[in-house]
């Protein structure tokens, strides 16, 4: 009698442990897969673009549409190449394993722009003049963001309306926007 009771309790504890692990894995998967949707539905400061930041940071989990001249790379960081017919290329990248999460946009005029975790412009470099630093205050940020969204906004558009089966907006807000 004691032996069967111990075995029964052990089996129940094992099943509960497995269910707890699966639930935690699902929560993490849900937050990453639907991160663009969740980021779109939070209040954020003007000049920040959390939808694009989440699309880049979670590129391995979100839907990536197959588009002509678009190439995705995810070996160590996430990089998207958009090549035009005249072989000019714009690149956007994210390195989630870096200590400070940075997003970098390289345009075909040999300028690179560096953004913080909320996708707010911090600084830039102009490699056509020898890596001179560009002050963020001198950049036409509306035109820059418009250019970025023209080239890479399809990622946000493809994921912003993908609603999760279980809405975990509160958990997303706790994790990313404390």
Language model features: what each stretch is:
Residues 1-24:
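N-terminal Sec-pathway targeting helices
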Residues 67-178:
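Extracytoplasmic electrostatic interaction patches
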């Amino acid at each position: 009698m004691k032996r069967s009771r111990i075995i029964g309790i052990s089996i129940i504890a094992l099943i509960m442990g497995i269910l707890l692990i699966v639930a935690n894995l699902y929560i993490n998967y849900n937050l990453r897969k639907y991160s663009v949707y969740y980021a779109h539905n939070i209040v954020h400061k003007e000049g920040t673009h959390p939808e694009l930041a989440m699309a880049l940071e979670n590129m391995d989990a979100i839907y990536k549409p197959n588009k002509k001249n678009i190439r995705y790379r995810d070996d160590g960081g996430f990089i998207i190449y958009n090549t035009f017919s005249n072989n000019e290329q714009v690149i956007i990248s994210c390195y989630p394993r870096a200590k400070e999460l940075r997003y970098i946009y390289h345009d075909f005029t040999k300028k690179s722009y560096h953004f913080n975790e909320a996708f707010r412009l911090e600084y830039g470099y102009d490699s056509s003049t020898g890596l001179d630093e560009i002050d963020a205050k001198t950049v036409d940020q509306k035109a820059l963001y418009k250019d970025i969204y023209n080239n890479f906004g399809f990622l946000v558009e493809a994921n912003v309306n993908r609603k999760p089966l279980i809405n975990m907006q509160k958990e997303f807000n706790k994790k990313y926007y404390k």
